[in-house]
Amino acid sequence: MSLLTEVETPTRNGWECKCSDSSDPLVIAASIIGILHLILWILDRLFFKCIYRLLKYGLKRGPSTEGVPESMREEYRQEQQSAVDVDDGHFVNIELE
């Protein structure tokens, strides 16, 4: 039994594609699943950072700052930003001879 559903055969007019059993429910289901898989894969590659960040952290944006004085909020923001900033002093330059 062959897994191929399409066979190309030479004719006088050129190459034709004859689909065998294209009305088979299994072929239709496989085609729909294949198309959905392709669409989901494309969306995943386009929005993977947003999707996985949403799955990891949910809808919360971070710790609540309700009831915290403004000076402490600013200090917290600066700490978070300094943790993200890259320090060039940690890189080592290696020169090859």
Swiss-Prot record:
Documented activity regulation: The M2 protein from most influenza A strains is inhibited by amantadine and rimantadine, resulting in viral uncoating incapacity. Emergence of amantadine-resistant variants is usually rapid.
Transmembrane segments: 23-43
Record keywords, A-Z: Disulfide bond, Host cell membrane, Host membrane, Host-virus interaction, Hydrogen ion transport, Inhibition of host autophagy by virus, Ion channel, Ion transport, Lipoprotein, Membrane, Palmitate, Phosphoprotein, Signal-anchor, Transmembrane, Transmembrane helix, Transport, Viral ion channel, Virion
Intravirion side: 44-97
Subcellular location, record wording: Virion membrane; Host apical cell membrane
Stretches for region Disordered: 60-83
Domain of life: Viruses
Gene Ontology terms for molecular function: monoatomic ion channel activity; proton transmembrane transporter activity
Pfam families from the UniProt entry: Flu_M2 (PF00599)
Residues with PTM Phosphoserine: S64, S82
Site (Essential for channel activity, possibly by being protonated during channel activation, and by forming the channel gate and the selective filter): H37
Gene Ontology CC annotation, any one: host cell plasma membrane
UniProt site positions, description: Seems to be involved in pH gating: W41
Lipid-bearing positions (S-palmitoyl cysteine): C50
Its biological purpose: Forms a proton-selective ion channel that is necessary for the efficient release of the viral genome during virus entry. After attaching to the cell surface, the virion enters the cell by endocytosis. Acidification of the endosome triggers M2 ion channel activity.
Further comment: When the channel is activated, one or more imidazole moieties of His-37 probably become bi-protonated.
Similarity comment text for this entry: Belongs to the influenza viruses matrix protein M2 family.
Binding partners and assembly: Homotetramer; composed of two disulfide-linked dimers held together by non-covalent interactions. May interact with matrix protein 1.
Domain notes: Cytoplasmic tail plays an important role in virion assembly and morphogenesis.
Protein name per Swiss-Prot or TrEMBL: Matrix protein 2
Native species: Influenza A virus (strain A/Swine/Hong Kong/127/1982 H3N2)
